[in-house]
Amino acid sequence: MASTFLNNVNEKNAALKQQILRLCISDVDYTIADFSRELECSIPTITKLVSELIEDGFIKDLGKAGFSSGRRPSIYGLNPAAGYIVGVDVRRRHLSIAVTDFKGQVVDYQSDIAFQLVGTSDSFKGLCDYLLEHIQKLGLDKEEVLAYGINLTGRVNHNTGYSYSYFIGEDKPIATVMEQQLSAPVFIENDSRAMCYGEYIAGCGARVDNMVFVNVSWGLGMGIVINRKLLYGKSGFSGEIGHFPMLDNDIICQCGKVGCLETGASGSAVHREFIKKLKEGKASILSEKFRSGAEITLDDIINALADEDMLAIECVERVGNILGRAIAGLINIFNPDLVVVGGRMASSKDYLLLPIKSAINKHSLNMVSKDTSVEMSKLGKKAGPIGACLLSRSSLLGLM
């Protein structure tokens, strides 16, 4: 279905069809006259192309517009029944799945499903088997699934389908291997970039042209939208803010270097600082659990914020201040409409957001930052799997 209008039409018409679909993806319904005006193309040409898109199943006539007297024009939008997209956010110990219709509406969402990710073919075969079982439980046929989007941490090349953090050394890209198992197109993406796209299309990034999404989880990542387009960079690896050499410390990052921003501004930094303070004898509602020898998790620390635990607040605020300085630099460079803070640490809410904003006020250029909003993610932990669905739809239609 993805190639229906990409192959059998001339290049100009294919480009116009893509632009029509791009407008529809913004979740706004259009009349023929609206399309004509936006694309600066004649009404007869637009009428013909919209008719072909309806025939292909991508677009639907949604009825007549408005309540004015006289002949009312038809309005058009994406056809939800064109098929389904499955988006998967894969973590080391769990995964989350969203299923959307073609319009991007979520029809199913499940999170924190137990799964052990290792870089082997058996691990990814197990993931494929689970996904096939999952869609069967939802009552969907394999043929109804138009594409799968798979989010992975680390370095991912969206165009080639390779992951450079998992499945290393195999002669085929992960995407190709999974396509053979799932019998549908598979698009892999870096988790932060997918979260960024999900927030941009379906969250608080809607209606802005330039956005930076900062994923503060165990590690630190970033997605960037410039002039309404997701930024990939030359090799597809843009957004590695966690490895910006900003800090003067001796902490060895997971990448093997020292001084990386991630070592001072991430969930792992909060956890490391919290455990260090407990060892020094600082008081916390988690002190007894620590003394018993039980594991203190990052979620334990985040949950302690709700009880106004001073040590947890101190550690989160420290990270927020460091992160805010880095975001101030990003604002000075990109001058975005919006900065969104998401990921696991976003559930810290104002304990993280307020020190970020304070540091931005101190370290950014006021003339640059005064028009930039800084907000917490609207989609929360759904941003990843929803972003995977929306990115896969755009990739399927040749819009990326």
Report each predicted region and the residues it spans:
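Glycine/GP-enriched mid-protein hinge/lid loop-to-helix segment characteristic of carbohydrate kinases
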Residues: 6, 109-111, 119-123, 177, ...
